[in-house]
Amino acid sequence: MELYFLGTGAGMPARHRNVTSIVLNLLPERGSIWFFDCGEGTQHQILRSPVKLSKSEKLFVTHLHGDHIFGLPGLLSSRSYQGGDTPFTIYGPKGIKAYVDMSLQLSQVHLDYELAIREIPSEGGVVFEDESFRVEAAPLDHRIECFGYRIVEKDLPGKLQQEKLHELGITAGPLYGRLKQGQTVKLEDGRELRGSDFVGPSIKGRTVTILGDTKPCGNSALLAEGADVLVHEATFGAEREDLAAAYDHSTTEQAARTAAEGGVGALIMTHISSRYQGEGAERLLEEARAIHPDSWLAEDFYSHAVPRRQS
């Protein structure tokens, strides 16, 4: 599991930062990648990255401001041109379906794959769940409806303790799979083996929280609680807290406090104003690390592995 940042700027493209798009690489876990937002120019960023559009499965939209969605129609079209034929699902606030449908209709784009669009209720909730992952959404505090997402990897089964089975004279075979699933197995000699006796502790799943644009609010704290990695906007430095409040954004220090108070592992700041370059960007990182030492300032094409934290 790895985060890859295709765009980390705020508002409009800049020379050193494109607008927002984040990829959650789940190729080892489920053979696919998930997008979070798709600002204009995202396809150009993909061409300069290891990201494979053909492996995309889902796209989660935080809100409908242009710097988060203007690249979406083109990305959907290119996915089809590149031979993508597996289903693709978009999740986002009310209005995302009308935006996508109208864009594709007016440009007469035909998709060679099944496209589903799920609009999220204003109160949020669980928007996706299967046997391996759960994704929760909650509304944030921005000028228009905006969501944050909490991606939870479910716990994995513990490792089969093969050495204990070897001691009983049981070699690899179909029984191993049944025991690993926790089943009780009866041997030909009458012995019964309980799977729970031969499987180690479950492996704790990881949690990633990705917030859309927001000023500090209760739901951003709830979504961040205990996350292994928190992706939080930090449009402004601490010296412009007044400007952040006026435009419903956050500062570096506010993002860091959310991470520190929530017991977060790593904080990754993104959605950075173009005014911060060079030494200015370094200062942003210093401000955050003074509060939450495990803080990082994303740049375009920055990647961050999501570790399994020790319980």
Give the residues covered by each predicted segment.
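Conserved beta-strand hairpin/beta-sheet module of binuclear metal-dependent hydrolase folds
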Residues: 1-49, 85-87, 149-151, 158, ...
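Metal-dependent phosphodiesterase/nuclease catalytic metal-binding core
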Residues: 23, 121-269, 280-286, 306-311
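Active-site neighborhood of phospho(di)ester-bond hydrolases with catalytic His/Asp-centered motifs
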Residues: 36-39, 56-64, 93, 209-212, ...
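Active-site metal-binding motif and surrounding structural segment of the metallo-beta-lactamase
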Residues: 40-91, 119-121
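Metal-dependent catalytic neighborhoods of phosphoester/phosphodiester hydrolases
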Residues: 72-78, 277-287
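A glycine-rich helix N-cap at a beta->alpha junction
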Residues: 109-120, 294
